[in-house]
Amino acid sequence: ITLNSDTNRGVADDVVVEFLGVPVFYTPHHEWVLEGRGSGFLAPTFGRYSESDPSDINDSRLGDYKVRIPYYFNIAPDRDFLLTLNQLSSRGSVVEGKYRQLIANNKYLDKGRFEVEGHYLNEDDITNNKRWLLNSSIDLSINDKTELSLVTNRVSDKDYFKEIAHSDTSATALHSHIDLTYADEAQDLNMAVFAETEQLINSGSASYLRAPEVSISKVFEGMNDRKMDLSLVSTKFTHKEGNTTTKKTGLRTHLQANFTRPITTNAYSLTPKLNLSSTDYALDNTTNESRSIYSFGLDSKLFLEREASLFGTDLIQTLTPRLAYNY
């Protein structure tokens, strides 16, 4: 065994692992990192599968095998890359890669994280088609109030997970989205823009999409604890069955408004509340719909106190009856 602190590597030749004096493992050469992490091969994995039903790992007819050999690249403290060769006996060689990076504070961004993963099979030995997977994820804190999230998930065809990855065979869709949010706690203001798409897989049929959705909420506070809470959400939505629109699609706008004006004295408190909820549907190729709901509430309390004594100890006895009414 040789330990080299200058290269941060350990090397061992003719390694024999024994258990109770019995050799159980041998390797002619092995290297490892002394401190931290380093580049190198990771443990390979072996498995079997069946083309008749790739999702059934207990199928007694398992006649195909897969071997995954990963190599890890330690690029820098804030980034790395994993390269894997996935050999499928019935399909061919799949090259897989996964890159990760942390984004530190700079003049453009507060902080963030970036990740991208790709799989590629140049020619499927059975279908003669190119098969691929591409996933990415970006989370950015643009400043102390604004954040951005972007997620994409795509595959070459709906049977990729069943025939190539041999996983997620129960999933029916791959979702992708972009989400931009703004939150100002000092101003009680929140805004967001959201949009999503999806790819149907594994014979998936139903889908519901919001593309886009814009929301804003604001709290207004006045004198004597007056408060008005407003929330507005506008959503462009679609229902799809396969690639054909078969359900209602259109624009939904929802407005929520709450008004409160607490009145508090040493003897009592009254809190009237007025709520308004309105939803409007501007539907395509059909009659528009809308509904409005109004509600009123009154919450009242009495504060009753008196001096009392218990076993020679002076106490204050408090009784707070409460009556609430909602319509």
Model-identified regions with their sequence ranges:
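Outer-membrane beta-barrel proteins and related beta-barrel translocases across Gram-negative bacteria
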Residues: T2-Y327
